[in-house]
Amino acid sequence: MNKYFDLSGQVAVVTGASTGLGLQMAKAFASQGANLVLLARREQRLKENAEALTKEFGVEVMALKCDITHTDEVKGAVEAVLKRFGRVDILVNNAGTGAIGNAEDITDEQFMHEVNVDLFGTFICAREFGRAMLDAGYGRIINIASMYGLVGNMIAGSAPYHAAKGGVVNLTRALAAEWGKHGITVNSICPGYIYTELTTATLDSDYFQDMAKRSIPLGRYGREGELDTCALFLASPMSTYVNGQNIAVDGGFTCV
């Protein structure tokens, strides 16, 4: 455990925690002593993750099946968390999706689904868990946006994703401005391409390896743990004066 990132006794809620970046961040929080609440739609995988995290780190882990686009389910999750732990200190809005296609081919349904999950779902969770934080006078909200919420992308058509993640970037600023006086900080992480169990095969392909060398100043994609440390920083006492920021963790992709 790192004394600077110590989260002992705190309760961290992570959405989209069944796989990928959500699970990586949950592990990072657990390694620093935080009790966890894992939210996702894949109930069996959540239960398996909860058991593994409890065994490895000795923290309490609560697994809740939840669709973040349904307000009643999120409200139920908040009630369950408060009943068990009595507090919510950290919320990581990680759940999301990705519609890929040229703008002229995207349907209304595809566009609205993207916005519904990535933007509206993030707002629902921030609002509902934020109420508990407002009551407590303390909270750390970390929204997972994307580097494509900051810049456009000529490589692959994904206008709905860009629009939704750009919305998350500005939602972060708005909530930070509104809730800062109540002891709540709201920041976002804007990841580039990061290795996870879901992305490894794609990122290791010749096409993506060549793209990394051409487009990313560091010449590679993010490794496991390189996003987690940013999340830990934003959740920890080390970031008490950091609010309303959108931090790109992208190897420099957005600076060129």
Regions found by a protein language model. Give the residues of each.
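Active-site helix of classical SDR
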Residues: A126, A164, T172
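Conserved glycine-rich cofactor-binding loop
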Residues: V11, S18-G20
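Alpha-helical segment proximal to the catalytic Tyr-Lys
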Residues: R131, A177-K181, T240
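Short, small/polar-rich loop/turn modules that mediate ligand/substrate recognition or access, typified
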Residues: V92, G180, T185, V242-G244
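Residue(s) in the substrate-gating loop at a strand-loop-helix junction
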Residues: S146
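Substrate-binding pocket helix/loop in short-chain dehydrogenase/reductase
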Residues: N102-A103, T107-V115, F208, A212
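Short C-terminal tail/terminal secondary-structure segment
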Residues: N2-Y4, A231-L232, N243-V256
